[in-house]
């Protein structure tokens, strides 16, 4: 083997390594792992031969450092008490698609080399930050009950489900224009504003977001909304969601009572015509007014006209303004 081939072989081996460190002080002496890989794997730091195919197996530790060699595509070291992993390095597992590391003692997680990752479950750890800017393939994220202060998932354009509830210090959440269908931010007590640009959102849970003042999920497909325990909520934008009467009534019932303070704004859109919208909503505007909320209803024909205007702006006016701007430079 010449030097070039040796270097390539060494690089390939390095890229197919996962390293983890277990806390000796709290370890049970066992390590639970589930591994799926292309080809064979080896595991250093355990007594038993490796199991693949996703089988969740209890290994006996022979070292606090465990090294997995092989082309791993799915790695599960998640647990609820059995593992005590304090460090996890997956930066050389470039073909990793699924990572389940929940229920450990991780304080950091580097995913900058894991562009192939589609599923991440890192909940119940001690992470204070999570950089997902390189995880462009992510579809499902569960980061419940860690210690995030901010979360930016705008790079995750394929995101379908996001669960980030019980991050009590989370003050900023940036979401992508993705096929997101479910969003859970329950009990994120410092979150003040939430904007969800997804057009496919069906489920929104903001229960217990005590500081939340504004939520914007207009033009989505919402059919389940949970807003209990949001005393500071003042602006709700669900224009274009076409909520039915039953869900609209539940929404109004769950809104906080704003009597004695600035009136709340509830923006709703119905797929029916303006005259029919009044019948569908029934007495909801009055019920909302009793709690000092104003309901703004945008009829379908007006919404369609606004969309046509926006389309004209995008296709005709904006390119013209850009050309004029370049001409004056």
Model-derived features with residue positions:
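C-terminal polymerase-core module
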Residues: 154
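N-terminal capping/linker segments that flank leucine-rich repeat
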Residues: 1-98, 115, 136, 157, ...
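Low-complexity, intrinsically disordered short peptide segments enriched in small/polar/basic residues
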Residues: 40-43, 133, 150, 182, ...
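Concave beta-strand-loop units of leucine-rich repeat
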Residues: 77-84, 100-105, 121-126, 137, ...
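Conserved, compact domain cores that house catalytic/ligand-binding motifs in diverse enzymes
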Residues: 88-124
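Acidic/charged coordination and interface sites in well-structured regions
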Residues: 88, 109, 130, 151, ...
